[in-house]
Amino acid sequence: MAYVINDSCISCGACEPECPVNAITAGDDKYVIDAATCIDCGACAGVCPVDAPQPE
C-alpha cells in the first residue's frame, strides 16, 4: 500500500522533506506521492496540517 495526497492539500510543502525515499513532489495543484516509491511509512501524514496524505 502507498499513501496518496487528497484534494485537501494546501501545497504547504511540509510533507516533502519528511519522506525518507523522496517519493513526494510538487504537482500542479497539490503535492503528489509516487506510489511505486512510497514505503508506506506515514511520515508525510504525521506532519501534514490538513491530513491530506491518506493510505491508498
Curated annotation (Swiss-Prot):
Protein name according to UniProt: Ferredoxin
Binding site for [4Fe-4S] cluster 1: C9, C12, C15, C48
InterPro entries hit by this protein: 4Fe4S_Fe-S-bd, 4Fe4S_Fe_S_CS, PSI_iron-sulfur_center
Function: Ferredoxins are iron-sulfur proteins that transfer electrons in a wide variety of metabolic reactions.
Cofactor(s) the protein requires to work: [4Fe-4S] cluster
GO cellular component, one term: cytoplasm
The organism's place on the tree of life at top rank: Bacteria
